[in-house]
Structures are given as structure tokens and as C-alpha cells.
A protein has these predicted regions:
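N-terminal intrinsically disordered/low-complexity leader segments
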Residues: 1-19
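Hydrophobic alpha-helical connector segments
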Residues: 69, 83-112, 164-168
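Helix-turn-helix
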Residues: 19, 23, 27, 31-65, ...
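Amphipathic alpha-helical packing segments from all-alpha helical-bundle domains
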Residues: 76-79, 83-84, 127-153, 162-166, ...
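Short amphipathic alpha-helical elements of helix-turn-helix/winged-helix folds
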Residues: 27-31, 106, 171
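Hydrophobic/aromatic-rich alpha-helical bundle segments in the mid-to-C-terminal region
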Residues: 114-119, 129, 151-197
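Short coil/turn segments at alpha/beta junctions that flank glycine-rich nucleotide-binding fingerprints
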Residues: 34-38, 89, 110, 153
């Protein structure tokens, strides 16, 4: 009887994939900040998340995979919201402004995780590093696509598209990394407005 109950609980947890995945990510992020990447075990992550160990191992075979999950979570949050926000928007300039503001907000909301990625990326194994890099390229391609669209439409200058896309990514990360400096004189909204102005001034004919 007890065994059947436990098996059902594990299956139920696995079926509730998004919710469980987020619990694991949040627990891992908190523990990595508190204890460090090396000192944190998967067992501790499982306990902190309130998820059974078999279910945790269903999602994560090794700790480095959680870093990949953190990056995926940020990317999917950005992609999902962007699709909704730019639906019906044809103007590349407006589309880019929406994408920039949204990405900055996603990065700010996941600031602790962004810091972890910068601090602990050297701890990742080769496969996880490669996956994280691929995910970053996917983000840059979203911006590249919109910028390219603006160039083709004659709205934007013929800039180095890849370089501009990565400039945008790093501007968003800079708020997280250097917030201690900027927050003394800029609100987050001011920071976004000024960076967006820099981006559009560089792009517009």
C-alpha cells in the first residue's frame, strides 16, 4: 500500500513537469548562493525543493545540468512573453523596443541566476557549457532577426547585426552585474530608457 502511494506520488510529480522543474531551479539557485556550487549536493537540492530524490534525478543527473536549466528557464520566459507582446506588431523599431524592454526585465527578475551563470560557468562540464552557449546564441538570434528586418526595411543602418545583438544582451546583464553602481543614480526604468535610446540611436538612419 505504502509503496503504491509513493510510486503514484513520484509519477504525479513527474507529470507536473513545469512546476517541479521550477522548484528544482529555485532551490538550486538559493543553495548555490548560500553554500556554493561545489558544496551543494543533489540530495540537498531535492530536500530544499520539496521534491522526492527519484523525481529530482529524473530531471537532473548531475549538478551542472541545473545551470543549463537555469539558462533555459530565462530563455523560455523571454521567448514566451515576446511572442505575445509582438503579436500584430509590424514595425521593426517598435518590435525591437518591446524585445529589449522585455529582455531587460526578464534578466532583472532572474538577477540572482544571471550572477550564478557568470560566477559558476567555469564549473560546468563541456556538454553543459556547450548547451548554455547555444541558448545564449538563440537569444542573440531573436535580436538579430528583428535588427535584420529593420535593415531590410530601410529603417535601420547596415550595422554588424551579431555584434549589436550581443551588445543588447550585455546591456541587460550589466544591470545585474553592476546594479550596485547604477542604482545610486538611476532607477531600473531610467536605465532601460537610456540604454534603449543608445541602441536606437546607433541603428536608426
Amino acid at each position: 500500500m505504502t509503496r503504491s502511494k509513493k510510486t503514484l506520488t513520484v509519477i504525479d510529480q513527474i507529470n507536473a513537469s513545469d512546476k517541479v522543474r521550477k522548484k528544482i531551479i529555485e532551490a538550486a539557485s538559493t543553495l548555490y548562493v548560500q553554500k556554493g556550487f561545489t558544496a551543494t549536493s543533489i540530495e540537498e537540492i531535492s530536500e530544499k525543493a520539496g521534491v522526492s530524490l527519484p523525481v529530482t534525478y529524473h530531471y537532473v543527473k548531475k549538478k551542472s545540468e541545473i545551470m543549463k536549466m537555469i539558462m533555459e528557464d530565462a530563455l523560455y520566459a523571454f521567448q514566451e512573453n515576446l511572442i505575445k507582446e509582438i503579436k500584430g506588431v509590424d514595425d521593426p523599431e517598435e518590435k525591437l523596443a518591446i524585445a529589449v524592454v522585455l529582455y531587460f526585465k526578464v534578466m532583472d527578475g532572474q538577477g540572482e541566476k544571471v550572477l550564478l551563470m557568470y560566477q559558476k560557468s567555469s564549473s560546468l562540464d563541456k556538454a553543459s557549457k556547450s548547451k548554455v552557449m547555444q541558448l545564449e546564441v538563440q537569444v542573440s538570434q531573436i535580436f538579430s532577426g528583428i535588427i535584420e528586418e529593420g535593415i531590410q526595411s530601410g529603417i535601420f543602418n547596415a550595422v554588424d547585426v551579431d555584434l549589436m545583438a550581443y551588445n543588447i544582451i550585455l546591456m541587460a546583464h550589466m544591470w545585474v552585474l553592476k546594479r550596485w553602481h547604477f542604482k545610486k543614480r538611476l532607477s531600473f526604468d531610467n536605465y532601460i530608457d537610456q540604454q534603449l535610446a543608445i541602441i536606437l540611436n546607433a541603428l536608426k538612419l
